[in-house]
From Swiss-Prot:
Organism for this UniProt entry: Streptomyces coeruleorubidus
Annotated TM spans: none
Family to which the UniProt record says this protein belongs: Belongs to the FcoT family.
Keyword Lipid metabolism: yes
Keywords, alphabetical: Fatty acid metabolism, Lipid metabolism, Lyase
GO terms, biological process: fatty acid metabolic process
Pfam families: FcoT
GO MF: lyase activity
Name under which the protein is recorded: (2E)-enoyl-[ACP] glycyltransferase
Role played: Involved in the biosynthesis of a unique class of isonitrile lipopeptides (INLPs). Catalyzes a Michael addition of glycine to the beta-position of an alpha,beta-unsaturated fatty acyl-[ACP], producing a (3R)-3-[(carboxymethyl)amino]fatty acid. Acts on the (2E)-butenoyl moiety loaded on the acyl-carrier protein ScoB, forming the product (3R)-3-[(carboxymethyl)amino]butanoate released from ScoB.
The encoding gene: scoD
């Protein structure tokens, strides 16, 4: 079940017409958290209607899904590498310190942006401390989107959480 108060706070940094994530259910399997989400994009925030989900929207949806998954994992103490974090830590680090180091997406069939589903999972989350550098959390993730008409998109992203508590 979606934590509505948490979702509202996670989406606070977004302009109203860019809040695409409508619901999210977070689960944990074998110590890894994942989220299954529902999205709606009534109108693109930057371009005339293309009739399909595009790469900019895929990235925005990924960000919203990822922020919710991390916040929920922190709040519920899920084993995703954020056990020492508090929600205050998350709010402090949400925008300046959670970086997408690598992002790739594959469009298999056009996805209807008006109503579609998505999911993401943490494949690995590790704390790293490079010699002479500041510690950070490295996370490999996978995601996918689909719609009722067999539209499909999937991809992978690598995250770096810097200035970690």
């Amino acid at each position: 079940m979606t934590d509505e108060a948490l979702l509202t706070q996670v989406l606070m940094p977004y302009k109203d017409h860019c809040k695409y994530l409508r619901s999210a259910v977070v689960t944990e399997t074998d110590g890894r958290a994942s989220a299954r989400c529902e999205f709606e994009i009534p109108e693109s925030c930057y371009i005339d209607d293309t009739g399909h989900l595009n790469s900019v929207e895929v990235n925005i949806c990924y960000n919203q899904m990822m922020y919710y998954l991390v916040a929920k994992s922190v709040k519920e103490g899920l084993g995703t590498g954020f056990e020492s974090w508090t929600l205050e830590d998350f709010w402090k680090h949400q925008l300046p310190d959670i970086l997408i180091a690598r992002f790739s997406s594959n469009f298999r069939r056009p996805v209807n942006p008006r109503v579609f589903s998505g999911e993401m999972e943490f494949r690995s989350v590790t704390r790293r401390a490079p010699a002479g550098g500041s510690p950070f959390v490295h996370a490999d993730t996978a995601f996918r989107y689909w719609d009722a008409d067999a539209g499909r998109c999937d991809g992978e992203a690598t995250l770096a959480f810097v200035n970690v508590p």
